[in-house]
Amino acid sequence: TSARGQLDLVKMYYGQLDKEGFIIDERFNGGGQLADRFLELMTRPVIYNLYWRHGKGTTVPSKTNTGPMGMLINGWAGSGGDGLPWAFREMNAGPIVGERTIGILVGPATGHQLIDGGGITVPGARLYYNNGNWFDEGVGVKPDFAVWDDPNLIIQGRDPQMEKVVKEVMDLLKTKPGVATPPPAKEDRTAKGLNKKNN
């Protein structure tokens, strides 16, 4: 969720808008900023559609994908890496798979330089849920499906967490596919056709 991560998101997300679903791999996300920009971009609804004279349709906003999503998390994700899956769950955006995040999300922090060259950060705020409870600092975000990153499988070239989230998103594609509204039947927009419609 750093500035670099936001640039990568835009590049990778827009490059794959034609896919039927998405998997957000936020394992090892060391943080940076809160995830509102990420989630606003990935969960934009289609407000209406345009059908152009040349026969192509577009959505408005034009950069949307309403297919199902899933997220991967692990114990190396913290701070903004806690915030992204936390917000993903708050928005009911899709299943979360993997291992619990670190739980070091406190809030926006300011940095202070020390005279020995070191530094400290001091959070000026703390996050809490819409239900009025504090974010579970020290606990982190627990996955919907706990899957251990088994090193025995990894050395075989497998990724058990990825395999599980792919299965979950593929299952969602069968029950909750993305919204793709076809254009209505063409109308006779001549004066004669419009008169018939209005009578």
How does the language model describe each region?
Residues 77-79, 114-146:
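Metal-dependent DNA phosphodiester-chemistry modules and their immediately adjacent helices/loops
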Residues 1-118, 153-161, 167-175, 199:
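Cleft-lining beta-strand/loop regions that shape enzyme active-site pockets
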Residues 146-153:
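C-terminal or mid-to-C-terminal helical accessory/interaction module adjacent to the motor/catalytic core
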Residues 171-199:
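Gram-negative outer-membrane assembly/targeting C-terminal domains
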